[in-house]
């Protein structure tokens, strides 16, 4: 599997991934602010970066990640794995590559994901995914745009280390 920095031509792939998860996260594909955020991360502006797992069997992306590269608190801003690639290690590989490229210790990595009562929490597997990567549930976060609960997950980085 290849993980690489996103390029401008990957933008439609990010929209394709977003379309697969709008039922959990709310509208993104038609939202100009989402488009701007993806482009800002692809361009690597202001402490932002984007990684992708391109499909080897055709167009589109197996996964994509938007990441905040400024420490000591780093942020997974957005991470989606295509439905056809979930459970195959794509998400883990994206996080591992972000850690390898940008995370320095001491520090921490934060992500906001579904709260425990959100309908997407079990179906998506997001909470379990982050826990398996060494993140721990922390404080509640503001509700998502669709009104569902959110929670911060945090992982302390106390030395140069890989994921789980």
Predicted region positions:
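Extreme N-terminal starter segment of soluble prokaryotic enzymes
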Residues: 1-3
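Conserved GNAT acetyl-CoA-binding A-motif
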Residues: 102-121
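Solvent-exposed beta-strand sheet faces enriched in polar/charged residues
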Residues: 68, 112, 138-141
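Glyoxalase I/VOC metalloenzyme domain signal
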Residues: 157-164
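Conserved G/P- and acidic residue-centered "switch" motifs that form tight phosphate/ATP-binding loops
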Residues: 89
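Conserved active-site alpha-helix within GNAT-family acetyltransferase domains
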Residues: 92, 116-139
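Acetyl-CoA-dependent GNAT
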Residues: 5-84, 92-97, 101, 157
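Short acidic/glycine-enriched loop/turn segments that link adjacent beta-strands
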Residues: 72, 144-149
């Amino acid at each position: 599997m290849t993980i690489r920095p996103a390029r401008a031509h990957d933008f439609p792939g990010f929209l394709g991934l977003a379309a697969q998860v709008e039922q959990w996260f709310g509208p993104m594909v038609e939202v100009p602010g989402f488009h701007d955020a993806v482009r800002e991360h692809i361009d690597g502006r202001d402490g932002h970066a984007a990684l992708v797992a391109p499909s080897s069997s055709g167009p589109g992306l197996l996964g994509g990640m938007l990441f905040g590269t400024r420490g000591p608190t780093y942020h997974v801003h957005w991470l989606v794995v295509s439905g056809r690639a979930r459970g195959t290690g794509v998400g883990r590989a994206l996080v591992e590559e972000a850690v390898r490229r940008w995370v320095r210790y001491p520090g921490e990595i934060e992500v906001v994901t579904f709260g425990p009562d959100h309908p997407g929490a079990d179906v998506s597997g997001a909470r379990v995914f982050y826990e398996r990567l060494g993140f721990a549930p922390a404080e509640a976060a503001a509700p998502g745009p669709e009104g569902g609960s959110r929670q911060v997950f945090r992982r302390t980085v106390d030395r140069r280390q890989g994921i789980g």
